[in-house]
Amino acid sequence: MKNLFLIFFFLVFSKAVFALEDVVMKGEAFDKNNKLVYIETHQFKRLISGEITEIKTEYHNAFGKLIAEVSSDFSKDPFIPDTVFVDYRFKEKQELTYDKDSRVISLKFTDMKSGKIKTNEFKRTGNMVSGQGFHNYILKNFDEKKSDIKFIVLPKLDYYSFYFEQETPKAEGERRFVLKISNWVLRAIVKEIAVDYRIKDHSLLSFEGLTNIDSDTHDSQILKIKMSYPGVDNDKKSL
């Protein structure tokens, strides 16, 4: 009887832990003049822990036109998802593929207008993070004060050393995390990325810094993105 109870408990517990929830998150990106630049809509699956297992994001400009989209699959690694990013304005595709057996990360940039392709690959090392895997990394290290990470910058086909730390939050009940490049020379030209989370449910509230979406003139842009969760009450757990 005891063994049957243990088996039943294990099955129920496992089902609860690995149950997936479908969530939609909307982000509105504003420039320094508080002008809406684009809207991002994230549709993702997550575990009860909040960890994302797969996500698809669409980006529409302020007039509602689809300008880019990205899909991420976390089945091989929670911090380094297989990723495909397409920018329809510039006809460009960026891809990341992770071979779990060889621990090799392959990056690919394709100019779909000319057909030109650039690639790079390297071995996965500890504390390596890519793209939308940053959220999972934050959840895993929510109580850490500071740590060093290697952040993969897909458009550059390379990774850079950053440090990740908590800073004074903007409001009570929130926690702020910042990502700063370690090289002090580059730090003068690369602005930090800051994200705000609600402590009680670990929900993402806002993002500030360099975004993965360039301006219409193909320049980098620093924006503030405000998050909301259509159809989800504020009291319920969000991303």
Regions found by a protein language model. Give the residues of each.
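Sec/Tat signal peptide C-region and signal peptidase I cleavage site
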Residues: 13-19
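Solvent-exposed helix/loop surface patches that form functional interfaces
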Residues: 106-178
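Acidic, serine/threonine-rich low-complexity disordered tracts
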Residues: 20-24, 29-79, 85-87, 93-100, ...
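Sec-dependent N-terminal signal peptides
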Residues: 4-13
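Contiguous hydrophobic, core-forming segments of folded domains
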Residues: 65-138
